[in-house]
Each structure stands twice: as C-alpha cells, then as structure tokens.
Amino acid sequence: MKLIIFDFDGTLADTEPLITQTMMKTFRTVGLPVCTREQCRAMIGLPLKETFMQLLPIDSATGDLCAETYEQIFAVDNRPGAVGMFPHVSETLQALHQRGYLLSIATSRGRASLEAFLRDMQLMSYISHIVTVNDVERAKPYPDMVDTTLSHFRISPEDTLMVGDAIYDIQMGHNAGVRTCGVTYGNGTREQMEACAADHIIDDIADILNLV
C-alpha cells in the first residue's frame, strides 16, 4: 500500500451537526418543507445540489438556489472550532505520514471550506493532495476523484486504499478498482458498509495502522 485516500466529512471530521443544521436552515430560508435531521444525514457525501434534489421534488433551478443558500449560511455558521475531529485522527494521520504513505482527500465539499477546516485542525501538513467535487466531471460514486488522484501520483489501484463513512465512498473505491475501508463512527453504519462490500470495516480510524 502506497496511497491512502480519505473522505473528509464523517471520516476525518465530525461535521454532521453543522451540515444537518445548515440544511434545515436552508429549507426554511428558501421556503421549502423542512426534512428531518435523519433524512438530511443520509444525504451527506453527495454534492449539494444533488442532495436537495433527492430530498425534495424540486427543479434544477431550485436545486441551485438551495446549494447557494446553503453555502451562504454555512459560511456564517462555520466559525473556527465549530467542527471537531473524530478521536485519533490527528495522531493516525501523523503516524501514516511518518511511515511514508501518501495521504490524499477526495471530498464532495468545496476546496475553500475544506482547506479552512484542515488549517483549523492542523492537518494540512499531512495531506499531499486534494480532489474536490469541483475538480471532476462526475462526483461520487463515480470513480473520477480516485482516478484523478491515481493519475496525479502515478500510482496503481492495487497500491491504494479508499477510506470513507458513506456508501458513496465505498462505491467510488470499487468503481476505481482500489481497496476500500468503511468506518462506522461517522454517518454510515456497519450494516451499510457490509451491504456495499467494503474490503475492511473499522470502528476507530487508528485501526488503519493495523491494515497497511
């Protein structure tokens, strides 16, 4: 194993409370029916517009409006320290980095907010490459984010591990031909990880140190 690609939301950072709160505020601001927190949580990992269009029967223009409104609300509410890391994230990334693994992130989040989170959490020095939803033609679960990362490093799928908490992460990894690791402490469950046939399933990110 040479390269480990991480999802961000629900895998490295516990962003679920802020994301679902922002989604529910977006519904109210736009004047749409408010979905439940659990309904919102189930969509985490998809691009914003697709998220809103899956939650409600809205047209493309309203989907764009929801995505724009979400980003505006998120920018206000996302103060430094508003989002924390899951246990053992920092020390695990540090250990992997020291062992010589290349660490990358593939996220449905935009680059500006991701980099702000990484700086706030002091993780930027461990990450060699970032691919966001804006860098590819097709988002998760298509393989584009992983394919772009493999091309950047000139590394084969056989030497790569995709780590994420959502079925979209595992499906993306499978579609790109890399090994996959599902985490159970984020927004997905062990049952979901088993159902989408993750190669490995862990309850703590530190367990990766025993896999690679």
Can you say where each PLM-predicted feature lies in the sequence?
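Asp-based, Mg2+/Mn2+-dependent phosphohydrolase catalytic module
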Residues: 1-2, 38, 94, 110-111, ...
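Short alpha-helical
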Residues: 18, 47-50, 61, 84, ...
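Short helix-capping segments at alpha-helix termini
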Residues: 28-33, 59-60, 98-99, 122-126, ...
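A metal-dependent, Asp-based hydrolase signature
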Residues: 45-77, 87-97
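Short, acidic loop-to-helix structural element flanking the phosphoryl-transfer center
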Residues: 76-105, 111-115, 143
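Active-site neighborhood of HAD-like aspartate-dependent phosphohydrolases
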Residues: 1-42, 56
